[in-house]
Amino acid sequence: MRQADITRKTAETAISVKVDLDGTGRYDIRTGVGFFDHMMDQLARHSLIDITLRCEGDLHIDDHHTVEDCGIALGQALTQALGDKRGIRRYGSFHLAMDDALVRCALDLSGRPYLVCNLPFPAAKIGSFDTELVREFFQALSTHGGITLHLDLIHGLNGHHIAEAAFKAVARSLREAVEPDPRAASAIPSTKGML
């Protein structure tokens, strides 16, 4: 069973996250940050990873700790659920078009965190959501999930569309990367013998 259940508590946030890599994309996300919840819904739905996420954060300050810490906890959950990564495809990539926005994602579940995030937003906010938090989330996810993650905006005019295209592109790439490879069912996808 490729599942994980993570609880993380700090002075800034209290988070619980459950994931099932072999799910159907069911989600139950409640962070108190509406736009971020919407993005996380997209991540679950389009990756086919079941995600249940609860976060109580210091939203009286701002959304930063909530968004970043959710990325940390989700990255930890993915790492736990993947185990030794035996039999997975490991790599995933996707071009995601959403109206005016076109985002390319390529990722490697290598155990070596690295983020390249070229997502210039046309404004500092989407409603009340700070667009810089999109990068903060993906940085935390990459670092704590051991993911090499490249995200590039090829075209885009609308901030909401850019953010949503990015989350969906990551979702579709994750879907591909965590998928079991029937031709290499018992193999770790690395010539080093470990990831």
From Swiss-Prot:
GO terms for cellular component: cytoplasm. Signal peptide: none annotated. Its main location: cytoplasm. Keywords: Amino-acid biosynthesis, Cytoplasm, Histidine biosynthesis, Lyase. Pfam families: IGPD (PF00475). Pathway: Amino-acid biosynthesis; L-histidine biosynthesis; L-histidine from 5-phospho-alpha-D-ribose 1-diphosphate: step 6/9. One of its GO terms (biological process) is L-histidine biosynthetic process. It is an enzyme of class 4 (lyase). InterPro entries: IGPD_sf, ImidazoleglycerolP_deHydtase, ImidazoleglycerP_deHydtase_CS, Ribosomal_Su5_D2-typ_SF. Its EC number is 4.2.1.19. One of its GO terms (molecular function) is imidazoleglycerol-phosphate dehydratase activity. It is found in: Cytoplasm. It catalyses: D-erythro-1-(imidazol-4-yl)glycerol 3-phosphate = 3-(imidazol-4-yl)-2-oxopropyl phosphate + H2O. HAMAP family: HisB (MF_00076). Belongs to the imidazoleglycerol-phosphate dehydratase family. This is Imidazoleglycerol-phosphate dehydratase. It comes from Cereibacter sphaeroides (strain ATCC 17025 / ATH 2.4.3) (Rhodobacter sphaeroides).
